[in-house]
Amino acid sequence: MGEEKIIEVKKLSVGYAGRVILRNVSFDVRRGEIFIILGGSGSGKSTLLKNMIGLYPAMGGEVLIRGENMIGAAGAVRERLLRQFGVMYQGGALFGSMTLAENIALPLEECTRLPREARVLLSRLKLQQVGLEPFADYLPSETSGGMVKRAAVARAMALDPGILFLDEPSAGLDPITSAELDELIRALSRDYGITFVIASHELASVYAIGDRAILLEGGGIAAEGKPVQLRDDPPNDYVRAFFRREPEKARAA
């Protein structure tokens, strides 16, 4: 993990229907780290993540990815930015009528001119990287929840981006399966130098893999730092209360 700032969020504000969700949020993500957007239900963590990838409009501010602003990007600039990251949506969001291999090949079909044989080969390679190559021809319904999440990570990696955004990757998984997914994320970060930005409230997972985190509250950042340090040495009463309350939810997940 280096000190290079691969993502810079500057004074980002987001709102809907007259209600401000995020106000003047600023932080940076360093190359190769696993960065956690942490917060309770309704804190805006998924909104922040989706805004960073250009799905939601912003009221103001910037999201710089390798120095280029995602907010308001259009045309060739937007296309170039979109190729720099992959996304795993909450629940995995695989197409149920497609096999795992076909799901992974879809971005290759839409975004490259590779022949079918090359797309098939690459999709199976990505499945191999997440431990699912033997299940390439299975439908999502024929696999487990943990396998669906792994396949969704593989699809996010299809175009070899340097950054992966994951929205609640451990949601709905039992503790053992969640720990296995954590091990995969850590291995991908270590072996391929991928930078991860993860929205999560699952503290067991956050402690296991998070290099740094921000804790959202009231539309802003209540704290920033290493997850274990925030837990053990909370900078304010809200952070202390959050980490006392949330572990019970994490163990019950």
Task: Give the role of each language-model region.
Residues 53:
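Helix-to-loop junction immediately C-terminal to a conserved catalytic motif
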